[in-house]
From Swiss-Prot:
GO terms for molecular function: translation elongation factor activity. It is found in: Cytoplasm. It comes from Streptococcus equi subsp. equi (strain 4047). This is Elongation factor Ts. The lineage of its organism: Bacteria, Bacillati, Bacillota, Bacilli, Lactobacillales. Keywords: Cytoplasm, Elongation factor, Protein biosynthesis. Gene3D superfamilies: 1.10.286.20, DNA helicase RuvA subunit, C-terminal domain, Elongation factor Ts, dimerisation domain. HAMAP family: EF_Ts. CDD domains: UBA_EF-Ts (cd14275). PROSITE patterns: EF_TS_1 (PS01126), EF_TS_2 (PS01127). Residues 80-83 are annotated as: Involved in Mg(2+) ion dislocation from EF-Tu.
Length: 346
């Protein structure tokens, strides 16, 4: 029987990423044959990964990578925040973003079939990571963003990589594009413009806003405060030319009733129309990048600020770790029991 030396164990660990005891056991079982030991560890890793397949992985990191005129943002999940800080996990996230930016897959299946520098597929890399790290590691999603030569990427990660953003800006420079990405990270827009909002979504959100006003008015009535008006519109998508024209006529009638001389109306009407637009685009302000107040200059919307510097936002992608994943809440006793059961089954 071959002698299993510390040097041999170290070599296997470096090649496979396995722990000391797992590497030693594999070498013993294969009589010191390095290639067979690697294959054995791989098979055991797949078995361990299969056992962990039904676990919920809602922690993790985003990865961002720019490759010329193509950029990728990815989300990779782990079960705990502790593992999300593991160097091997971070390396896997970064390698995933790079592979996707360079390979430009059309969907997750194509992404997982990409060949990594190690020669294994991305899917195998995740199986092996699950086995060696000891938690379910899963590739969740990616977005590819493209630009032209005269446009700029703004790549930004926030909160230790829990949020990843890529923005494309035309005009300005990379620093401006990054500032817009910082805004996207903080303010969570879901689309670029109101034209991308679903009409039913706008109606539903407007109903929610008016419900909030109704509750507020009940509180105001208790302290003899005047009621707030309900919102008739929530988005520019609902403001037809006729609606805007009628709003201007209503303002003129209001000014006439107040006895304001017509010669000063032209100075008053634009400000009141701005107020009308602000009051009737609350859904846009919550969900569309261009309509949000810019965090770098709160006197302007993102669109108005970019206009002022001869720039324009073209597109963006924003991922936040765990969005839409239902976390499983275990009490401490259940967690300990599950950990002990897993240890006995491995």
């Amino acid at each position: 029987m071959a002698e299993i030396t510390a040097k041999l164990v170290k070599e296997l660990r470096e090649k496979s990423g396995a722990g000391v005891m797992d590497a030693k056991k594999a070498l013993v079982e294969t009589d010191g044959d390095m290639e067979k030991a690697i294959e054995l560890l791989r098979e055991k890793g797949m078995a361990k990964a299969a056992k962990k397949a039904d676990r919920v992985a809602a922690e993790g990191l985003t990865g961002v990578y720019v490759n010329g005129n193509v950029a990728a943002v990815v989300e990779v999940n782990a079960e705990t925040d502790f593992v999300a800080k593991n160097a091997q996990f971070v390396e896997l996230v970064n390698a995933t973003a790079k592979a996707i930016a360079e390979g430009k897959p059309a969907n997750n299946d194509e992404a997982l079939a990409l060949i990594m520098p190690s020669g294994e597929t991305l899917a195998d890399a995740y199986v092996n990571a699950t086995a060696t790290i000891g938690e379910k590691i899963s590739f969740r999603r990616f977005a590819l963003v493209e630009k032209t030569d005269d446009q700029h990427f703004g790549a930004y990660q926030h909160n230790g990589g829990r949020i990843g953003v890529i923005t494309v800006v035309e005009g300005g420079d990379e620093a401006l594009a990054k500032q817009v990405s910082m805004h996207v990270a903080a303010m969570k827009p879901t689309v670029l413009s109101y034209t991308e909002l679903d009409p039913q979504f706008i109606k539903d959100e407007l109903a929610q806003l008016n419900h909030a006003i109704e509750l507020d008015n009940e509180s105001r009535a208790m302290v003899n405060k005047p009621a707030l008006p309900f919102l008739k519109y929530g988005s520019k998508a609902q403001l037809s030319a006729d609606v805007i024209a009628q709003a201007e006529e209503d303002i003129k009638a209001e000014l006439a009733a107040e006895g304001k001389p017509e010669k000063i109306w032209d100075k008053i009407i634009p400000g009141k129309m701005d107020r009308f637009m602000l009051d009737n685009t609350k859904v846009d302000q919550a969900y569309t990048l261009l309509a949000q107040v810019y965090i770098m200059d709160d006197s302007k919307t993102v669109e108005a600020y970019l206009d002022s510097v001869n720039a324009k936002a073209i597109s963006f992608a924003r991922f936040e770790v765990g969005e839409g994943i239902e976390k499983k809440a275990n009490d401490f006793e259940s967690e300990v029991a599950a950990t002990m059961a897993a240890a006995l089954n491995n």
